[in-house]
């Protein structure tokens, strides 16, 4: 079924391209050539649309893989893929900044992004160092940290500080749903007062992926969690389902169809006094504390956290 699917697709879109390794791109090229029965043309003659910012997070390469990659590629970035030596990429640069409106801050971010930041930029950022943030329901903030253990430690500590016993909500897996693909914990431990982040857009548009909130109450009988979002809106949150989907090509209808292999059902939230910079890429927060304890360990981390 995969062969027919790959043969029939016309356009391949890859988002967050900065995090895709060169060897993955070459593998995609080879697979598309073989299954499109078109060995001559790059990507089997398919259109390829790459979206992202190479100044954001870099590809993740484990130490044992790095040694092998270095033998074949000058960098792990997608643009070092060998296939790009055979084609002319058309580059389209987006100019307008939508996330920030302060021109001075946009300028500082540009300097950090291009590695041209100077003393004046650092001085401006340092005016925010050690700033006290008012903790109230109307003034939620989130800590971005580079290390997962820092994030876990902050969330566990904050949860333990809240009064009352924690409540554990068991997620339900049906069929095939790999643990590595779970969007939130299968055992979700929460308390009233806990700060959370939504990890899925709401069908009724009450929240989006990345909205911060505080748990106002938990009704176990009704299986409802009541959340006040950072803009003061009260929402009742029910369990949601995620699907593990495989795509296949239908010979009779000549259409691409979805095959659901399994599902995961859980509340679309996770603890969020802190999250990793990697998890924050693509999200927008109104109030942020950045914890660079231990420094950054990957290219683009500082820029992604600040932007």
Summary of predicted features, one role per range:
Residues 1-307:
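Conserved ATP-binding/catalytic motifs of P-loop helicase motor domains
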């Amino acid at each position: 079924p995969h062969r027919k699917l790959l043969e029939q697709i016309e356009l391949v879109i890859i988002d967050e391209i900065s995090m895709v390794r060169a060897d993955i791109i070459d593998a995609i090229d080879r697979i598309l050539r073989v299954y499109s029965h078109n060995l001559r043309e790059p990507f089997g003659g398919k259109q390829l649309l790459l979206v992202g910012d190479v100044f954001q997070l870099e590809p993740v390469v484990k130490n044992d893989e790095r040694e092998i990659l270095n033998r074949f590629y000058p960098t792990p970035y997608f643009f070092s893929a060998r296939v790009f030596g055979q084609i002319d990429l058309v580059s389209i640069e987006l100019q307008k900044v939508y996330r920030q409106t302060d021109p001075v801050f946009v300028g500082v971010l540009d300097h950090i992004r291009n590695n041209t930041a100077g003393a004046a930029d650092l001085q401006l950022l340092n005016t925010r160092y050690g700033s006290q943030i008012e903790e109230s329901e109307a003034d939620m903030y989130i800590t971005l940290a580079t290390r997962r253990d820092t994030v876990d430690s902050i969330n566990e500590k904050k949860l333990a500080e809240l009064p009352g016993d924690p409540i554990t909500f068991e997620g339900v897996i049906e069929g095939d749903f790999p643990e590595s693909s779970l969007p939130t914990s299968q055992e979700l431990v929460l308390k009233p007062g806990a700060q959370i982040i939504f990890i899925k857009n709401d069908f009724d548009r009450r929240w989006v992926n990345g909205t911060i909130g505080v748990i106002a109450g938990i009704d176990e009988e009704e299986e409802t969690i009541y959340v006040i979002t950072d803009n003061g809106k009260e929402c009742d949150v029910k369990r949601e389902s995620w699907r593990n989907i495989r795509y296949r090509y239908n010979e009779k209808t000549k259409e691409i169809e979805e095959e659901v292999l399994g599902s995961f059902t859980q509340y679309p939230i996770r603890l969020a006094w802190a999250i990793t910079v990697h998890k924050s890429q693509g999200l927008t927060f109104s109030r942020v504390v950045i914890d660079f304890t231990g420094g950054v360990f990957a290219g683009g981390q500082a820029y992604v956290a600040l932007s």
